[in-house]
């Protein structure tokens, strides 16, 4: 049931990471821990477990790709957003995958909102952007509760769009480019007739090295495992 639900729409988890050549950085603000309740700490531990399971599964299915760069947080946020539109067995399977089966949707949403807000404010020397959007085919009915909870808890941009228009992919690609500082300018070539809804998460990261290194000291070499 979960597989059928996921294939009925499209999930795009977009991750862009850019290195900085700028040696300057703002004065770091004092480090502070993210204050979590016991339940929220348990959810964070479960989220970490999901991240490793997700990475392991991707590695198994993408064996022909030597390098993988993925964001389990993006996947978790996408599935959490969709879970707000699910019921019955589909909802149970989604929360089981995320590791949040012992928590209500309200608890999951509140935790995700708190986590994202804390991450965005955690390090002033790092540029971090986390954005969500939902693109609905014009005329396709979506429950108001699904839209409102994703707007409120995930700060999602929700827009109805004429998927038959040749400009539709450009509009979605434009959102992606804007949220990744043009690191990923294109995610769609065309929109198939069967598409009804696109749910996107974009994560942009640009960090400053605490200890800079010279580019001239870096060269491509074969990577070897410990064994």
Please identify what each model-predicted range represents.
Residues 2-8:
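Sec-dependent signal peptide recognition
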Residues 19-22:
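Bacterial signal peptide processing site
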Residues 45-59:
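Mature N-terminal segment immediately following signal peptide/propeptide cleavage
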Residues 27-47:
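Post-signal peptide N-terminal segment of mature Sec-exported envelope proteins
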Residues 56-131:
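Post-signal peptide N-terminal segment of secreted/secretory-pathway proteins
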Residues 14-17:
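C-terminal motif of bacterial Sec signal peptides marking the signal peptidase cleavage site
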